[in-house]
Amino acid sequence: LKSVTIREIAKERKNLSFKALSQHINLDTVKSISKLTEEEAAKKAARDAELKAVMEGTDDRFLLVIGPCSADNEEAVLEYARRLAKLQEEVKDKIFIVQRVYTNKPRTNGDGYKGLLHQQDPSGEINLVRGMVAVRKMHKRVLTETGLTTADEMLYPENLEFIEDLVSYHAVGARSVEDQQHRFVASGIDHPTGLKNPTSGNINVLFNALYASQQKQELMYNGMEVETSSNPLAHVILRGALKENGSVVPNYHYEDLLKVIDAYKKGNYKNPFIMVDTNHDNSGKKYNEQIRIVQEVLTNRQWNEEIKQYVRGFMIESYLEDGRQEPGEGIFGQSITDPCLGWEKTE
């Protein structure tokens, strides 16, 4: 038998398992694309300071993270942002708005549209290098052309460095919240980070994730051993649950909110904050139900002082047109993933 070294075997395995589709991507080169000017960065920092005050409770405005399920079309997202910016000006004394610009989408079985990062044209080829450029461009345009800051989902923790200078709010999704790497990277984010309950609805799992995100952690991150500073602005998002038989279990009702408040009280968590996701398994993806869900939660805030104290944010899926379409149908401003509220109902 021919003698082979472990290193040669490893090299052969690497060649079999992964095929390089691009050269090594340089972080500094990527961040030089769509880089904020000093003036633009200062405007973002001012908005970020306001958001931090909302999260800490020193600013009593209600937080609204709102926008399309997926940011699939740059011009439609920008048109939505322009309208939203005008609405923010009208309600600025009561509500602080951050726009959802979700550029990568988790897929239950790996199939389907995975977001702007993967496909700049939903019907086109996959190119993640061009996707990074498109993602940065979209986040910057929303900020610089409308003054709104943006939210995105941290689907891939290793990509955080590529967008952290442009994004003001990060979310860890229901499929990712049990993953240790997501929890540990969340503990190093300098911005508010919402942790969704897992699809099972298990609140213990959710608060384990919250605890991990609010502690200092040591981990391997992008080729280095690092220690995080902890994230005191990490908080929970209630998005409902899904049973094995496919039925949904909402968790925005009065009793559900009290259970989550009780979980907050039992732990030594910083800046207690509950956000209610009005779509997904809370609405059963019946997008019009989002209006009723908001009304119910607001009523419960009036009824119970603790709910008013803890529940201080909504995450709402909204776009220019009601509902959804299949990729390629070409309806401007209508979702190609989960159905969303149209603009008139959003207003």
Q: What is each stretch, according to the model?
A:
Residues 69-72, 271, 279-285:
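Short acidic, Gly/Ser-rich segments with clustered Asp/Glu that frequently serve as metal-coordination loops
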Residues 67, 276, 342:
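Conserved, mostly hydrophobic/aromatic
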Residues 52-60, 266-271:
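Glycine-rich phosphate/diphosphate-binding loops that line cofactor/substrate pockets in enzymes
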Residues 63-76, 338:
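Conserved phosphate/anionic-ligand binding catalytic regions in large, soluble enzymes, centered on
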Residues 319-347:
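Internal helix-turn-beta structural module
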Residues 4-8, 12-56:
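N- or domain-start disorder-to-order transition segments that initiate the globular core
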Residues 3, 8-15, 81, 94-259, ...:
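Active-site-facing alpha/beta catalytic cores
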